Regions:
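Bacterial N-terminal signal peptides that target proteins for export
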Residues: 1-10
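C-terminal segment of classical bacterial N-terminal signal peptides
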Residues: 15-24
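Extracellular glycan-recognition regions
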Residues: 26-234
Length: 234
């Protein structure tokens, strides 16, 4: 009897392991006090999976502080000014400063720039983004309109990506996305960390074009400032 009970308990324990992991992995996005967009001319849209859980754009915050944009999330979100458009060959870059690494979460979350935005603000919006984490890795992902990944679920580690000294410490990343002929590249802190053929991006289920609106992208429960958001023609 004891042996049978032990076997049954072991089976139950094994069955529960993935369930517990899934529950622990579901970190809910917070609602930021005084949220919304207060920067004239700017717009935003949260991810569809965030909206399906009852989140709204007003639960994240985009504000202007001097020459910087100050973002606090909230649900994962993209922000843009519709006047910011890029066509042909170009580079979009910005500098992101997380003043207190992981101050709103117990693990790192990413932020970066996006390009090739089309149908922005609608359920059919598409764009590509490159984003960095303060632990030394980066991701290249997009929406077309369903989410897609270019370098895997966890992204890639790269020495070019700055690492915070620890929780509560500052970390800064300069992130750029470039369209150069038949390729699209992501550079972080001056080093190219990823390059993809344009044909692998402008295709069914991904981008409509590499021409389009550019802006900034933040994961949920993250806070950082953005400076020097610029587009340069190649």
């Amino acid at each position: 009897m004891g042996s049978a009970y032990g076997s049954a308990a072991a089976i139950v324990a094994i069955m529960l392991v993935p369930v517990v992991s899934v529950v622990q992995g579901q970190e809910e996005a917070r609602a930021v006090a005084g949220g919304g967009i207060s920067v004239p001319g700017w717009a935003g849209k949260i991810d569809a999976n965030e909206a399906s859980r009852g989140q709204k754009l007003e639960n994240a915050k985009l504000a202007k502080e001097g020459n910087a944009l100050h973002v606090t999330t909230g649900p994962a979100v993209a922000y843009w000014n519709p006047a910011n458009k890029a066509t042909g060959n170009y580079t979009v870059k910005a500098t992101f400063t997380e003043p207190k690494y992981m101050n709103l979460n117990d693990h790192p979350h990413p932020y970066g720039v996006f390009i090739a935005g089309n149908d922005m603000g609608t359920d059919q919006q598409s764009y590509l983004y490159c984003a960095a984490y303060g632990k030394g890795n980066f991701i290249v992902r997009g929406f077309g309109p369903a989410a897609f990944q270019m370098n895997g679920r966890g992204g890639e580690m790269n020495d070019a990506v700055h690492k915070a000294a620890g929780p509560g410490q500052p970390v800064t990343q300069e992130i750029a996305l470039s369209v150069k002929g038949d390729n699209v590249e992501c550079a972080i802190n001056g080093k190219t960390v990823a390059s993809y053929p344009k044909a692998d991006l402008v295709t069914s289920g991904k981008l409509k074009s590499t021409d389009g609106i550019y802006g900034i992208r933040f994961g949920h429960n993250t806070e950082a400032t953005v400076t020097g958001l610029t587009m340069t023609k190649q």
